[in-house]
């Protein structure tokens, strides 16, 4: 029997993960229809995607760009309806417009639409790690109530998901997330003090956006992923390890209590995990070639240097503290990374600002969205204010 076409919303469509998702979707027009595209401010790029994919709806996050979007769609002769703002996106995501949501909006800005998809019982391909870090308990609770199917798109969590064939962790002894080590693996703090934004965005194996590239360079990306794994799979910190694996071919390992270890290997390309999420439990072509072990025949592993790259340690500390501490970590990191990319602070000031926020703000129970958003706002305020107290980049 022919399966119905899945209607897919791609949030963060103009970013690197959005582009990868659309590439996979375009390969399977009989299985998927792009029903909604959403972007933050890149209205021209969103219009170009609308001309290619002809979605039913398009949303621009910046409400001041609504007229540009609407007029551009009309000029192109498209029937695509234009919307603007966070509330409009959340309403569309929760409606019958889509049954599958690729949540790839970077940062806390993606939280409302991600929660809306979870509450509405959608299949949620989760690439917005900040939603789990900021509000993981709430997100997983909403998904449990509604029956939403959360499939992680980060390569590490997707690998664990595949090894477990679900999110059930019965019989698991521990999981190991791998990290490339970023472009500065082996650097000391003296060397890191001179790092520029351009250098930090030059990731050795993955093609990613600016913010995620910097997070990878500081190892904050891996710290956030430890917190994600805790929420996604219900594992305590002591059952979540991290190893640096510069080849980025082994994406995670799952060790079971019987001594067995399963690992997922593939070339570093987000289209693989997106194809898994879109078709699961079936498999579809992603456009990614299989792994040639004769060509890629070296696999190295080492422990991360958490003294030099302290963001990973700070993330673990925030997870152990619990409550609103991960929300503070996330918000302070977003402000610090943005300031670094603007050339306002040095590379080593990123963890310093995060630690300042974690030690300054009190811990509260993370039991409501209102509490989390209040803490997020306050963290951004004090981190912004602290920027002037740290030395300028060298």
Swiss-Prot record:
This protein's record includes keyword NADP: yes
Enzyme class: oxidoreductase
Catalytically driven reaction(s): 2-C-methyl-D-erythritol 4-phosphate + NADP(+) = 1-deoxy-D-xylulose 5-phosphate + NADPH + H(+)
GO MF annotation terms: 1-deoxy-D-xylulose-5-phosphate reductoisomerase activity; manganese ion binding; NADPH binding
InterPro entries on file: DXP_reductoisomerase (IPR003821), DXP_reductoisomerase_C (IPR013644), DXP_reductoisomerase_N (IPR013512), DXPR_C (IPR026877), DXPR_C_sf (IPR036169), NAD(P)-bd_dom_sf (IPR036291)
Pfam family, one: DXPR_C
Keyword annotations of the record: Isoprene biosynthesis, Manganese, Metal-binding, NADP, Oxidoreductase
Known EC number: 1.1.1.267
Binding locations of 1-deoxy-D-xylulose 5-phosphate: 129, 155-156, 180, 203, 216, 221-222, 225
Positions of NADPH binding: 14-17, 40, 128, 130, 209
Coiled-coil annotated residue ranges, if any: none
Binding site for Mn(2+): 154, 156, 225
Pathway as given in its UniProt record: Isoprenoid biosynthesis; isopentenyl diphosphate biosynthesis via DXP pathway; isopentenyl diphosphate from 1-deoxy-D-xylulose 5-phosphate: step 1/6
Signal sequence interval, chain numbering: none
Cofactor: Mg(2+); Mn(2+)
GO BP terms, alphabetized: isopentenyl diphosphate biosynthetic process, methylerythritol 4-phosphate pathway involved in terpenoid biosynthetic process
Assigned protein family: Belongs to the DXR family.
NCBIfam families from the UniProt entry: Dxr
Record function comment: Catalyzes the NADPH-dependent rearrangement and reduction of 1-deoxy-D-xylulose-5-phosphate (DXP) to 2-C-methyl-D-erythritol 4-phosphate (MEP).
This protein's name: 1-deoxy-D-xylulose 5-phosphate reductoisomerase
Lineage of the species this protein comes from: Bacteria, Pseudomonadati, Pseudomonadota, Gammaproteobacteria, Lysobacterales
């Amino acid at each position: 029997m022919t399966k119905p076409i899945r209607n897919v919303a791609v949030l963060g469509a103009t970013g690197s993960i959005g582009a990868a998702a659309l590439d996979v979707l375009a390969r399977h027009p009989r299985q998927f229809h792009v029903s909604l595209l959403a972007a933050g401010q890149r209205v021209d790029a969103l219009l170009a995607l609308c001309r290619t994919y002809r979605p039913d709806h398009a949303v621009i996050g910046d409400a001041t760009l609504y007229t540009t979007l609407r007029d551009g769609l009309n000029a192109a002769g498209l029937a695509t309806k234009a919307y603007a703002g966070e509330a409009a996106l959340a309403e569309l995501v929760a409606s019958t417009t889509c049954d599958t949501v690729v949540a790839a909006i970077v940062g806390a800005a993606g939280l409302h639409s991600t929660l809306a998809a979870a509450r509405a019982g959608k299949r949620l391909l989760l690439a917005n790690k900040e939603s789990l870090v900021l509000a993981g308990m709430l997100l997983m609770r909403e998904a449990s109530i509604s029956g939403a199917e959360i499939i992680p798109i980060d390569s590490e969590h997707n690998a664990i998901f595949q090894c477990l064939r679900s999110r059930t962790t019965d019989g698991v002894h521990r999981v190991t997330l791998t990290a490339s080590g970023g472009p500065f693996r082996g650097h000391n703090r003296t060397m890191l003090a001179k790092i520029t934004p351009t250098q930090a965005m030059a990731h050795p194996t993955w093609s990613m956006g600016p913010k995620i590239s910097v997070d990878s360079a500081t190892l904050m990306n891996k710290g956030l992923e430890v917190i994600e794994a805790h929420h996604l799979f219900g594992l305590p910190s002591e059952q979540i390890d991290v190893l640096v694996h510069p080849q980025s071919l082994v994406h995670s390992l799952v060790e079971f209590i019987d001594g067995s270890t399963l690992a997922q290997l593939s070339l570093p390309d987000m289209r693989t995990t997106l194809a898994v999420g879109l078709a699961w439990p079936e498999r579809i072509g992603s456009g990614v070639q299989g792994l040639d072990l004769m060509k890629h025949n070296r696999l190295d592993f080492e422990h991360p240097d958490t003294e030099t790259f302290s963001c990973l340690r700070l993330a673990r500390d925030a997870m152990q503290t619990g409550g609103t501490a991960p929300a503070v970590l996330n918000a302070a990191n977003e402000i610090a990374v943005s300031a670094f990319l603007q050339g306002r602070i040095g590379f080593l000031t990123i963890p310093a600002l995060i630690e300042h926020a974690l030690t300054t703000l009190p811990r509260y129970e993370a039991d409501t969205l209102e509490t989390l958003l209040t803490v997020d706002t306050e963290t951004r305020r004090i981190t912004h204010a602290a920027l002037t107290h740290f030395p300028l980049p060298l």
